[in-house]
Amino acid sequence: MKITVVCGHGLGTSLMMEMSIKNILKEMGVDASVDHVDLGSAKATQSDIFVGTKDIAEQLVIQAVDGKIVALDNMVDKSAMKIRLSVALVELGAL
């Protein structure tokens, strides 16, 4: 399972979300690779799940990335992040 976190420049926002997602996956006992990229690199990235804020997720839909897209309303709301990741993982049969 590969999860890619996407933000505009692939620096601060996506790195913060990557660390949160790694902690959430560890709590859930899910083994997955988690990386972060900028929006421009997302289309060329192979991933099962792409995670981004709502505006980034809209751009991922437009780019037609090949993977499940998880849109977050608030990048610091870990409980919402866990719920949305759980739904995506269940849909992909990883949970």
Regions found by a protein language model. Give the residues of each.
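N-terminal glycine-rich "phosphate-gripper" loop used for MgATP/nucleotide binding
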Residues: 51-55, 73-75
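Ser/Thr/Gly-rich flexible loops in soluble cytosolic domains mediating phosphotransfer, phosphorylation
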Residues: 68-95
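Short, structured coil segments at secondary-structure junctions
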Residues: 45-46, 63-66
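Conserved active-site segments centered on acidic
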Residues: 2-38
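Conserved hydrophobic residues forming the short capping helix/wall of the S-adenosyl-L-methionine
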Residues: 21, 25, 60, 89
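Short glycine-/acidic-enriched loop or helix-start segments at secondary-structure transitions
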Residues: 15, 60-62, 81
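Short, hydrophobic beta-strand segments that form beta-sheet elements in well-ordered domains
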Residues: 34-35, 49-53
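Short, polar loop motifs at secondary-structure junctions
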Residues: 38-39, 54-58
